[in-house]
Curated annotation (Swiss-Prot):
Keywords in alphabetical order: DNA-directed RNA polymerase, Magnesium, Metal-binding, Nucleotidyltransferase, Nucleus, Transcription, Transferase, Zinc, Zinc-finger
Family in the record: Belongs to the RNA polymerase beta chain family.
Gene name, Swiss-Prot/TrEMBL: RPB2
UniProt: Mg(2+) binding residues: 799
Top-level lineage group: Eukaryota
Pfam families recorded: RNA_pol_Rpb2_1, RNA_pol_Rpb2_2, RNA_pol_Rpb2_3, RNA_pol_Rpb2_4, RNA_pol_Rpb2_5, RNA_pol_Rpb2_6, RNA_pol_Rpb2_7
EC number: 2.7.7.6
A Gene Ontology term for the protein's cellular component: plastid
Description of how the protein assembles with itself and partners: Component of the RNA polymerase II (Pol II) complex consisting of 12 subunits.
UniProt-annotated binding residues for Zn(2+): 1123, 1126, 1141, 1144
The name this protein goes by in its record: DNA-directed RNA polymerase II subunit RPB2
Amino acid sequence: MDMEDEYEPQYNVDDDEEEITQEDAWAVISAYFEEKGLVRQQLDSFDEFIQNTMQEIVDESADIEIRPESQHNPGHQSDFAETIYKINFGQIYLSKPMMTESDGETATLFPKAARLRNLTYSAPLYVDVTKRVIKKGHDGEEVTETQDFTKVFIGKVPIMLRSSYCTLYQNSEKDLTELGECPLDQGGYFIINGSEKVLIAQEKMSTNHVYVFKKRQPNKYAFVAEVRSMADTQNRPPSTMFVRMLSRTSAKGGSSGQYIRATLPYIRTEIPIIIVFRALGFVADKDILEHICYDFNDTQMMELLRPSLEEAFVIQNQQVALDYIGKRGATVGVTREKRIKYAKEILQKEMLPHVGVGEYCETKKAYYFGYIIHRLLLCALGRRAEDDRDHYGNKRLDLAGPLLGGLFRMLFRKLTRDVRGYVQKCVDNGKDVNLQFAIKAKTITSGLKYSLATGNWGQANAAGTRAGVSQVLNRLTYASTLSHLRRLNSPIGREGKLAKPRQLHNSQWGMMCPAETPEGQACGLVKNLALMVYITVGSAAYPILEFLEEWGTENFEEISPAVIPQATKIFVNGTWVGIHRDPDMLVRTLRRLRRRVDVNTEVGVVRDIRLKELRIYTDYGRCSRPLFIVEKQRLMIKKKDIQTLQQRESPDEGGWHDLVAKGYIEYIDTEEEETTMISMTINDLVQARLNPGDAYSDTYTHCEIHPSLILGVCASIIPFPDHNQSPRNTYQSAMGKQAMGIYVTNYQFRMDTLAYVLYYPQKPLVTTRAMEHLHFRQLPAGINAIVAISCYSGYNQEDSVIMNQSSIDRGFFRSLFFRSYRDEEKKMGTLVKEDFGRPDRASTMGMRHGSYDKLDDDGLAPPGTRVSGEDVIIGKTTPISQDDAQGQASRYTRKDHSTSLRHSETGMVDQVLLTTNADGLRFVKVRVRSVRIPQIGDKFSSRHGQKGTVGMTYTQEDMPWTVEGITPDIIVNPHAIPSRMTIGQLIECIMGKVAAHMGKEGDATPFTDVTVDNISKALHKCGYQMRGFETMYNGHTGRRLSAMIFLGPTYYQRLKHMVDDKIHSRGRGPVQILTRQPAEGRSRDGGLRFGEMERDCMIAHGAAHFLKERLFDQSDAYRVHVCERCGLIAIANLKKNSFECRGCKNKTDIVQVHIPYACKLLFQELMAMAIAPRMLTKDVKLAKDQKKKGA
């Protein structure tokens, strides 16, 4: 297309050739979110588990085969020589989520009911079971009886909300509202016992991948190559293989050759590599070297192998090599044949299982093993850098699917073991086998429930369990919920001060949000996904393998090792499948097929030209992201495609999947990204075409859809994050999760333990484009406040702010706070159960000192009751048996078990829910609401990590005002700006001013061409000072302020930390039982700790009496009687006024001393360990003298 064509009018014939603009890219992004939503990675992963993985696990399990233990019965001659029972599991079925009431009725379960009634949102799982009884006669004929049990119930599987088996799947907004659900709720979590649980993605190193690391010297080894090998089908724990090259100098100081040794699974010592080759059946040195070096002219590499060849010179055939390995196995003292068989088994089944575990895999294994050594040698020769542990291409994420898959596999195996045991018992005792009894559905039901409820992944109290995999979904704000659903965790110990894994790595660009990570010990280990990342669910490798076969891949049987250096090695999911002579054509074809969706779109194709490798990935857990495809410096997507996208009637036709299918967009994973050339903006692409001389690259292959999509959920809410110092964006990402807003639209129908709702939330005047996809406009969390930056009176020093009291009275940042209390009537035995009701002081023991007046006769406070600290809101009693109280019938017949309000809170009873739980027992939730009005000490923040507390509130008359009569709502100290460099806040302020004036929203999306100058000019046009300064007048005196004040609307957030929840003091109060020191914490009405540092200051001051008062009198003073002779604690009976020390038979020389109770406890604990701490109350010498006199 020529230059002049560019500027021709729209109705040209070449209309379809018109290029799109960066603005049009947002239409594409909208299409993505419309189709995918924000938690697609969770849903797809779970669906994969339900639809494929579960069936695979059941199919994988071998038949249960049982032979009766024959009881020797001499007189009785049986009809059959032997009987074999076989049980196997077939097709599985999952129904919609159901619940069984206590009376046995079943009904469809909806999430709302599960939340309110503390049920688990799970669906029953059924399986077809076939039982075969094979009877062998004495004459060798067989009789088989087959019995089919269809749809046997084997357990309940928790269902992820909005996944394809959920009752809410593909419901319209209207239906969702009628079901009491929030239409904006994204799903992606589970409901376990009424609480919402998220599975956090777990990061791990990718399996079947050769890594070579250089060891820090001095070390026994110079280089280590490792492969975590895991077969696709069997999900056994991966077997790791290490190949290590020893350092030149051994630990003793003598120079040993650089031997190379390998670790094999279940073998105690390291085995020289040459012996492994010989055990695989490659005996001649030439054959072995061919599998490692490929090229005999490479003398350097051959030389490195010399020591290893010499080391293994003594072993020259396969049997001896196998015996060498077998000798070092687990079992000791078996025959040679057994050892050889054992070694063969290990080489076949346990070594590199992903290459193959069948009979004739030796060639493939030898080649792969040779490849590992080849890589190790390349690294040792310095021809190739060591691998990077933190590269994101080497990482995989375990989402809900794989996590639940591993758990289900374990539980299903346990179930089959139990079935086997039960059937064996039945058969041995000659009973009939009833499969309904044999299959304990509780195994799977409670196993899955336990792991999801506690977050301990794996069996209860077993080793190798991971903690914190499932977490309670954060429902503070809508953004915090979304962010929690897109979080991922690296299971590295939090204590390790390792910097490397925590740093932002180049390969994380576009995959992980650079700003959103917690501060403190988990920094950089807990990450969040960027907006458009998709995590692959994995697809089968066989279509790829078939394709490679057709397109001229040569496998190991057909090739001679000499050709390997010239050809390109081909790997599929880390397994070396063969070589190819024309990789360029192969890659082009693969990509073409992928763009036509003939090959799954999530397949990754990585061509490493320098290494002559082509790596193809189809596995699960790779991060990938969509990019525009560029060919000949032009985007494949054109203006007309954008128009069809915008004009479509229904969301089903066209849309995102259509763009992918047409080959305009493709998903690129982290590793493939390094083989592409990506243009940052559409504009860069146009520039590269117009003047190729200045272009960064003349072969762009892809183009970013929009650079701002590298940010995650919380960082996408920040306006102009590209104008802030980077840690500020991190702080805001953390605070945005604590801002009050409307966390979900159906909060009236929910009984959350804690909930905060802002009275009058506003959408921000200054927005980012990504916000509309995060539904921040529908569910905002803040208010556009008029903010002045000024020192006014000095009550805004050190990050505090001055707030306008009149604005507060009008409802500025007023919020609701809900807290729910729950209780249930538990069964105490078979007959006795607890009862809700108003306790009667006459007959109930252990009643609280709070007020019981607010309760109705049913034991519940009715809605609309005003309650304050310690008032009882749920009355509950338990009957007590009459015979205690030492025989005499006590006047009490019941014991009090009521729930009272937290003592520091007041409010109104908002809603009471009385229902039954899964066991049919009555159970109640009471929600109390209170209004929180901003006051001194409450915490607020802007969207730029500028947090502050209210230092003072002034009424409107006392606030400064502008000529137009505007008074600010908030005054921030100017010292908050320079050192923190949050220029974004200043730009937001003047843009907000323009936006308010023109009645539009300001666009503050990062990496766009908005400049401060443009905004300033627009502000000037509106008739203001162009940099946002205003003349103001002092509210106290009415005089004009000498400085110009920077003023304008800025979006502020109210954070959940409020002074009413924190204020705490104590005069007297409860003490701990063990140490008799004051309790700890506000909730227990505890004391304030006078710690070691405070103690040191008092010592430095020399304030001895004060020190004694704090650490002794006010803490745990205690009086104890001590024997003067031996210095141990004596017995004192103060009633009878008698004292004695039995050890010394001393009844007179006894004194009383004052020591801390904790000290007395320590002394007694020492005595229990047979160490006698003696308290000598007078001089030792004197005591001896007296003893002499006494004698």
